[in-house]
């Protein structure tokens, strides 16, 4: 849909708006864009630069106060269709970005971020405090953030790496990958997709990973103290290290590693569950990909 919009409006993007406004510390940026792109980068200046490519029929409005800078577009013929924003902000500035047919990207932020779109990708590097990223029909990707992390998609994948803090990730039809995670509270849920968690298991922490039709692969550090409960109806369980199963029934069992102060819940209805040491999951993935590649070559 984004490609279609860009194709139809490509010739109309003839107008350029480039405005810089001063801002005070603590101000927030709000941008709403029906279609196109919102790309945010950072600099050391106490100012916001808004560069926009848009139709000559559109007008970019900027409402700046001590607390907030609001950016939106208006057209003489109803709502603007496609606007591509390139915005530069102070690194610590809080961001509230939204759109419909809109790709959103942020690079180098050290502030709170809220980004939400319907049909478009969300790709963020950075973020401190509350970081909430959502897309209905688009991938959600986050790296190098710390704080309270909330990631959501409906029909695409979620990827997070180099994250510190509480993490919640949820999608319906997509995989979830959480790698290099430093967290005492992590949760991931999907219906049709695989989940990978390669991160810390902290004493007293809570971790829950659930999928209906997909596999779970979770890393457990060697010195972890965790009580593990496993539930799978139509799948296998395996571990790269010895475990002593207790309370075993046909579809559910548990075991304890170390003192068991953390809790880890694993659920998959139609999928396998595998535990390994940190870093081992990537090796397993590479091994499986090489195996599938060799099989494809044999079939050819």
Where are these regions (language model features)?
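Intrinsically disordered, low-complexity terminal regions
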Residues: 1-300
